[in-house]
Amino acid sequence: LTPGIDPRATPACVNACIADALHFGDANDPESNVSKMLAGSKTFKMHAELGTDPNFHYVYGDNDSSEANSGDMVKTVNNSADLGVKPWLQQHWDWRAAGNFIGGGTGGGLAVMGALAAALGATPGALQLAAMASVALGLFMVFLETGRPLRAPLNVLFHPQTSWMTREAMIGIVFFPVAFAALWMGSRELAIVAGLLGLAFVFTQGRILTEAKGIPAWRNAAMLPLILSTGLAEGAGLTLAATAVFPIVFGGFQMVSLWAVLALAVLRVAAWMNYRNQLAGNAPEMTLRVLGGVNPAMIVVGHLLPIGLAGAAMAFPVHAPLSAFLAGISVAVTGWAMKYIIVVKASYNQGYAIEKVPARGISGIAAGVQPGWK
């Protein structure tokens, strides 16, 4: 049977297309029907810039077609003709998906702070316990989101060679027994290993987002340093708040936590600003509008305020507990809000972009359109 020629080896949509607008065949065979068509035609692949190498070729003219009217794609916003093709908000990942990134990132950050405490001779037990609880809560959010929750815990382990979700799950499987053993045995060495696993867990979460090629707000390379910095900042923020409330438990770890919050807040605001700069011109208008709307609060409340409060805690020890608590909570809550907004509110998909408008009559090939972008 020859694909594209024999109806029994050809998709029904191609067989049923009375306009002969759809063609199917083996593009790897130079003698196939589609290979011959492609050789004599001008074609493009939709969203080829994503690097996914789709096997759909769009023919917009033959090799002799004029492109006198062709040029760069025209980006349009708020055009009535855009309906149905411009980017729309994805509906597959909701607050439960955001909860996974919140719980996992915060838990990984807490595990890193526990490793730091162990390395400095402090007692990391409370931080390890909180880290395990936070990561477990995040994974439970994923469990709530799965369509077949009884099959998902097993099926997620099947593709370590390609899936960052699989790698996230595998690191989680190792993280829990190591962190529990460190807590049970009081082992500083295992606490440090658990911290490294927590950092790796946050890294996989960042890679999950960057590999979601259909969502411009996620796939940008600047997403990874943002996810890493905010996860660490969230863990440091909660640790700092805990040292203010339970000073006896954390015995002198407050100053280390203050410096960690200061450093990570600076790193995160730099990552946030770089993320927004990288998205400019590389994301739909609605994504940029959502992120731009929360930017002032992210900068002022989420970073300048906690940096100032942490500095005040260092300068005025008498008010250190209150200032440290507020600084830590501000950093953590801002990270949670940031992830929720990126995952749920700013996650507009790519939409559809037509790189070239097919030749009709003598007018030649016109420039393509990219609705919802500017």
Located regions from the model:
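Juxtamembrane/interface segments at transmembrane-helix termini
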Residues: T146-G147, Y340-Y352
